[in-house]
Amino acid sequence: MSKEKEEIKIIAQNRKAFHDYFIEETYEAGIELVGTEVKSVRQGKVNLKDSFARVENNEVILYNMHISPYEKGNIFNKDPLRPRKLLLHRHEINKLSGYVSRKGYTLIPTKVYLKRGLVKVELAVAKGKKLFDKREDIARRDAKRELEKQFKEKQLGI
């Protein structure tokens, strides 16, 4: 029996994280949500800007992830910015707490997606970039773009 490719639907991405941080390692984590939050996530009403995670009491908690209230949720809607527990294996939590205990490392969510009907968060172990690192990345990207442009012109014979 052949394995089918797992269906992944990306709901939200934190593009700013790749600009502001060096991504060391990523983990896939489940997230503890209530019913109306799941419905909002399925509609794509998630914002990862300024969100981060911490290891507290051997649990990973996600802060500042905004999930808009579900329109038809009435009294069952929760606070959009409430802390949410991430579901990881114990050995993964221990590894993450080891990373975070080192100076300069933090946990940043980079993606929220649906995998086989379940809401998942891609959590990255990240180290903050300095201003000169960001400038260096921009210069490298511009140089690469210029080289590709020259190569394309040479190919076309312009």
Swiss-Prot record:
Which CDD domains does UniProt cross-reference here? SmpB
Which species does this protein come from? Answer: Caldanaerobacter subterraneus subsp. tengcongensis (strain DSM 15242 / JCM 11007 / NBRC 100824 / MB4) (Thermoanaerobacter tengcongensis)
Q: Which Gene3D superfamilies match?
A: 2.40.280.10
Key word Cytoplasm present: yes
* Family stated for the protein in its record: Belongs to the SmpB family.
A single GO CC term for this protein reads:
cytosol
Keywords tagged on the record: Cytoplasm, RNA-binding
GO function terms (MF aspect): RNA binding
Where located?
Cytoplasm
Task: State its role.
Answer: Required for rescue of stalled ribosomes mediated by trans-translation. Binds to transfer-messenger RNA (tmRNA), required for stable association of tmRNA with ribosomes. tmRNA and SmpB together mimic tRNA shape, replacing the anticodon stem-loop with SmpB. tmRNA is encoded by the ssrA gene; the 2 termini fold to resemble tRNA(Ala) and it encodes a 'tag peptide', a short internal open reading frame. During trans-translation Ala-aminoacylated tmRNA acts like a tRNA, entering the A-site of stalled ribosomes, displacing the stalled mRNA.
Q: What is this protein called?
A: SsrA-binding protein
Q: Which GO terms describe its biological process?
A: trans-translation
